[in-house]
């Protein structure tokens, strides 16, 4: 799990100072029809969108299914992962994601 976090940090070289929570959204170009449409509804979170196809093998070994949503706190600690199932759809209520974001930031 530490390797996964390190790979993500190195891949994106993102400064995470403006938000306490970062959401990494991973999907593939061949799965655009199943894009998760609710990201814009989420508050108090920095959203990074990543194309699975463009990432190295090590990244792909860590993300087993797309689409996927991965939440990190301000210390870059992995907090929660949601992944698409056999349907290649992400069936998670945005309220569930927002609840986890609020929990991380202490609201």
Q: For the regions a protein language model found, what residue spans apply to each?
A:
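Sec-dependent N-terminal signal peptides
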Residues: 4-14
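Soluble periplasmic/extracytoplasmic beta-strand elements of cell-envelope proteins
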Residues: 22-25, 68-70, 81
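N-terminal post-signal-peptidase region of extra-cytosolic proteins
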Residues: 52-59
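Structural micro-motif
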Residues: 61-72
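Non-catalytic, surface beta->alpha helical segment in thiol-disulfide oxidoreductase systems
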Residues: 73-107
């Amino acid at each position: 799990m530490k390797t996964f976090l390190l790979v993500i940090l190195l891949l994106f070289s993102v400064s995470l100072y403006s938000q306490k929570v970062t959401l990494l959204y991973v999907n593939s170009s061949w799965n655009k029809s199943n894009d998760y449409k609710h990201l814009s509804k989420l508050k108090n979170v920095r959203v990074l969108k990543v194309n699975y196809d463009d990432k190295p093998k090590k990244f792909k070994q860590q993300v087993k299914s797309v689409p996927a949503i991965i939440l990190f706190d301000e210390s870059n600690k992995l907090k929660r992962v949601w992944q698409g199932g056999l349907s290649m759809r992400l069936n998670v209520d945005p309220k569930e994601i927002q609840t986890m974001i609020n929990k991380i930031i202490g609201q």
